């Protein structure tokens, strides 16, 4: 049995959310909307309303704060996500994780595929699973295909941390949470992360907590 919001047309759901104003409430793990494949965007939401919704996603992402947000995370099962990362990290973290600034991007109907055999494993978290982080091994490079908010085609290769963000947010649109791909022995509270595992890579955590990392890219 679905929740009442499941039966509301997408455009009406978006209108309801935007009527409140300010950052949108973020849906937590356990809500069915996070476990269903999102509906591809094909004009179900009128252009002016869609533009407002994208801006609300951006505002909510900044307020959280986070580096990405998918529409299902605010209760809208639409295949749309936003990403942006100012990458305010020390140089050693930037180098180890390949974390470079990313401008604001809107991803409409995105999909990705690996661009090479490399894998990279790092701690990551999720706004829908607050308070926790875990190590996830992901493709080191991916080819993203999508459209932007203006309907222009996107076909681009992302590497390093931007590739991780693309994978994380696109996974949301397929009903997949990062914990589905995580090494669960690495699961750590934010407090434990700050106290014990703030190093640029998770090698020390892997040794202490007893989990394996993929090859040299880890």
Swiss-Prot record:
Protein residues bound to Fe cation: 126, 168, 172
GO molecular function, one term: peptide deformylase activity
EC numbers, comma separated: 3.5.1.88
Annotated catalysed reactions: N-terminal N-formyl-L-methionyl-[peptide] + H2O = N-terminal L-methionyl-[peptide] + formate
Source organism, top-level taxon: Bacteria
Cofactors that this protein relies on: Fe(2+)
Record keyword Hydrolase present: yes
Alphabetized InterPro entries for the sequence: Peptide_deformylase (IPR023635), Peptide_deformylase_sf (IPR036821)
Enzyme class: hydrolase
GO BP: co-translational protein modification; translation
Keywords tagged on the record: Hydrolase, Iron, Metal-binding, Protein biosynthesis
Residue positions of the active site: 169
Details of cofactor binding: Binds 1 Fe(2+) ion.
SUPFAM superfamilies: Peptide deformylase
Family per similarity comment: Belongs to the polypeptide deformylase family.
NCBIfam families noted in UniProt: PRK00150.1-3
Function: Removes the formyl group from the N-terminal Met of newly synthesized proteins. Requires at least a dipeptide for an efficient rate of reaction. N-terminal L-methionine is a prerequisite for activity but the enzyme has broad specificity at other positions.
This protein's name: Peptide deformylase 1
Species per Swiss-Prot/TrEMBL record: Streptomyces coelicolor (strain ATCC BAA-471 / A3(2) / M145)
Source taxonomy: Bacteria, Bacillati, Actinomycetota, Actinomycetes, Kitasatosporales
Gene from which this protein is expressed: def1
